[in-house]
Regions:
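Class I S-adenosyl-L-methionine
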Residues: 31-34, 38, 83, 138, ...
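ATP-hydrolysis module of ASCE/P-loop NTPase motor domains
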Residues: 47, 66-151
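P-loop NTPase Walker
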Residues: 1-71, 168
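Helix N-cap/coil-helix junction residues
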Residues: 15, 43, 91-92, 146, ...
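Conserved helicase NTPase motor core
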Residues: 21, 29, 49, 124-195
Length: 195
């Protein structure tokens, strides 16, 4: 298990706990991991960083760009923007709520898998309509100076590619990275972790 690997690294190889990063998919899993680690280490608090992909990437962006909660687009704001975009683009919709959820998921798929918008085929509307919706959604989001949850991953990737000194800082900080449920990560998560 990950907890036994962490204990092994610390006790056998004398790795400093501060150099270990554990990434999970949910806050609940992160909390469980911290509890199990504390129990495995005889109830001692160990300064291993444990968090979700979004939490860790947001922390990096917050440190680099001084972002705060005011920069995060809520789900409600996201759907409000998409509702306006769909109306302005005159996209035909049968069930608005389902359509909004599906379009938001497709936008997330593009970002999470670093797909090309030009070759992406939407299951919900024509390619031209989807590209128009995507571009206007992105323009509206940027105008508000906000990022959505998927942007946290994309921006972290772009940050590390464009600013090697920032990447180097985080590589030195976290020399050991362990991922819970590694087989479930998406392309952008993999690309950032691999760096």
């Amino acid at each position: 298990t990950i907890v036994s690997r962490i204990k092994y690294l610390i006790e056998k190889y004398k790795v400093r706990p501060e150099e270990i990063l554990v990434v999970t998919f949910t806050r609940y899993a992160a909390g469980e991991m911290k509890s199990r680690l504390c129990a495995a280490m005889d109830q001692r608090e160990i300064p291993v960083t444990v968090g979700t992909f979004h939490g860790i990437y947001y922390g990096i962006l917050r440190w680099t760009y001084r972002m705060g909660p005011q920069n995060i687009l809520s789900e409600e704001e996201k759907y409000q923007i998409l509702r306006g975009v769909i109306s302005r683009q005159k996209v035909e919709v049968f069930d608005e709520e389902d359509f909004l959820q599906d379009i938001a998921a497709e936008i997330g798929r593009i970002k999470n898998n670093r797909l090309d918008i030009e070759s992406f085929v939407s299951e919900k509307c024509s390619a031209d309509a989807f590209r128009a919706v995507y571009r206007e959604y992105e323009a509206q989001r940027k105008k508000l100076k906000k990022i959505d949850f998927d942007d946290m991953l994309v921006l972290c990737y772009e940050l590390f590619v464009s600013r090697p000194e920032v990447l180097s800082r985080w590589q030195k900080k976290f020399r050991y990275i362990l991922i819970d449920e590694f087989q479930d990560i998406n392309r952008i998560q993999y690309d950032v972790i691999r760096m």
